[in-house]
UniProtKB/Swiss-Prot annotation:
Protein name: Phosphoheptose isomerase
Assembly behavior: Homotetramer.
Record-linked Pfam families: SIS_2
Organism field: Pseudomonas putida (strain ATCC 700007 / DSM 6899 / JCM 31910 / BCRC 17059 / LMG 24140 / F1)
Limits of the SIS domain: 36-197
Primary subcellular site in the record, as a coarse category: cytoplasm
Highest taxon in the source lineage: Bacteria
Catalysed reaction, written as an equation: 2 D-sedoheptulose 7-phosphate = D-glycero-alpha-D-manno-heptose 7-phosphate + D-glycero-beta-D-manno-heptose 7-phosphate
């Protein structure tokens, strides 16, 4: 197969996964946006975590809220727990890599805050511990997962929201996670500041 054919095949796979996910995920994304808006209206904040590409997604989400998405508006409170290398390495060195997010949540999280927990497999141990810490702090969890939801899915409470991408391919899951994050940002803005359409 030549390279351009391979590229087309990858585009087609991404489009197909998004089409399959659209109707399945729309109600979950809507519910997650309502949870987030309610928290923001009640002086809560967003915390976000993940590993690797999911860490990048956590930072992307937080930056869109703190700065802006597609319109001028006030900054919204969001913290990516993936960015402070001194904190991450000190916790990993002194305790365990599994605690790099949970210790931050115990310090920063407050009742009514929301944790955006991201893992393509749903089995990242440090994200699982982050969910447990968020529940201990009476936070609500929005989980971006894939495959069968992994260990994260089994920890979620009725008030939590799982956005589970119907795919087993990591790259396709990540692509839909990014789209879901953009949908959340758009819905948060439109609910808080009105629709621009």
């Amino acid at each position: 197969m030549d390279m351009q054919s391979r590229i087309r095949r990858l585009f087609e796979a991404s489009i197909e996964t998004k089409q399959q996910a659209m109707d399945i995920l729309a109600p979950h994304i809507e519910q997650a946006s309502l949870v987030m808006v309610n928290a923001l209206l009640n002086e809560g904040k967003m915390l976000a975590c993940g590993n690797g590409g999911s860490a990048g997604d956590a930072q992307h989400f937080s930056s869109e809220l703190l700065n802006r998405f597609e319109r001028e508006r006030p900054s919204l409170p969001a913290i990516a727990l993936t960015t402070d290398s001194s904190t991450l390495t000190s916790i990993a060195n002194d305790y365990s890599y599994n605690e790099v997010f949970s210790k931050q949540i115990r310090a920063l999280g407050q009742p009514g805050d929301v944790l955006l927990a991201i893992s393509t497999s749903g089995n990242s141990a440090n994200v699982i511990q982050a969910i447990q810490a968020a529940h201990d702090r009476e936070m609500i969890v929005v989980a971006l997962t894939g495959r069968d939801g992994g260990g994260m899915a089994s920890l979620l409470l009725p008030e939590d929201v799982e956005i589970r991408v119907p795919s087993t391919v990591t790259a396709r899951i990540q692509e839909v996670h990014l789209l879901a994050i953009h949908c959340l940002c758009d819905l948060i803005d439109s609910q808080l500041f009105g629709s621009e359409e």
